[in-house]
Every structure is written in structure tokens, then in C-alpha cells.
């Protein structure tokens, strides 16, 4: 539960386009200032942003994507997360299409050990087709990607529990994979981002943390969907932490302290337990002012 005057926890997200020196410095300062969580987005190229959704817009195959330096999320995250001592860390979110579930699970278990149990595994079905095409990564239809995500979540659960994991499906197979080390706290928290009915069912079954992007009204509606999905399987929805991910488009939520405080209050009223801001380095003055409210 938040202990600050704002009534919600506050997290910050840095992207893979940050340089190694800059992300080290920022994460160190943000932890010292008292923010509750620090996250890394998982992309390998940028496509610009729309003015409507804040998500990368499709880039025509005939137009090369922008030449923006991007570091790999998990490598960068391992470097900075292991240097923290208090703050929760995580991915927001890793698409199922980038890595085999067994390798992703091993990466997550490694970060869990490196942070002393302060890692949340954020997962999603992926949505940037041009990014996949650019790097030769398969991008199946949405329904298949959600099925792959469900299998990934089941594999993660298997690797956390028994001594060996075996699994066989249309997409993945494991054959007596050794399940060591175990998570520091017995379980790595899983964040799921998504809004469609099947994704909500996966959240209800597997998630410890649900993250969504959108307006306060939209977020409130998705939380109601989550509660309905939980009710269908007999799960208490209060077991799932609820957060909103706020990015720079269409309106920069960190353009001023007043703007940031208004945004935080709006999403607190919508039912959020945590507000997670996407940040740039030039946001630091507002971030420092926000930090004073966390004391």
C-alpha cells in the first residue's frame, strides 16, 4: 500500500533508447528519490508515436524506420537492476514473440536472484508488426500470439514449482528441464498488459499485476472487465495489483508538476494502485518535484 500523500505508488519507465551511462545515472537517482518501481520497455527499434494512442504507429515497409540507437531491454535491465537495493524492477512489457518461454523464464529467474526478489515479469502478446518484420521475427495472428502467451505463462509456472519441467504443445516443448534456481520469494510476480477478453481471462488466471494504458474512464472500464473475469473463475480481484502506463503521447503527463498531479489523482480515482510514467531525461525537474511528495 502507498505511504505517500498521493495515495498511489509511483513508477518510472525508461526505454531501450537510453544510453548505458544515462540509464545508470537516472535509475540511481530515481531510487534515491523514493520512487516505488523502475521499469524497462522491451523494443528493438522505434517507429514514432501516434497522437491518438501513444503506441508506435505502423511504418510502411517502403519507408525505413528511424535510425535511433536502441539497446536490448533485458541486457540493459540486468545491468541497472542489479545496482539497485530497494526499488521494484521489471519489464513493461516483453512480447511473447521475442524469446522462447524457457529462455525468458531463465532470464527472469536470473534477474530475480540478482535483485533479491525485486523483479516483476511483464508480459504481453506483442503489437508492433513492423518491428518484427525488420528483424526477421515471426509475427503470427493475434489469436495465435495470445495462445503462445498462455503457454508461456504455464511454462513459467512449471519452472517455478517442480524439480523438472516437461511440456509439449503446438508451439513449445520442454523435456525434463531442470527447474533451479527457485524464485527468491517462491514466485516471480507476473504483470500482464492487454484489453481483449482472452487477455482478461489470462490476467484473471495468471497475473499478479495488471497494466493498461488509456484515459481514466477507459482504465476504469478495463478494471471492471478484469473483475468480471476474476469472478468467473472464483478469484479475488483484489489479489491483482492495478496500474496504468502513461507515455508521452498524445499529451505529455510530465509537462509540469500540476499536470502530473492532476493525472495521478485522476487515475487514483479510476482505481489504480500505481501510476507508471514513461520518462525522458528532460523530465527530471518535474520528477524531482514529484519526489518531494513521496517523502
Language-model segment annotations:
Residues 1-295:
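Active-site-adjacent structural elements that line small-molecule/cofactor binding pockets in enzymes
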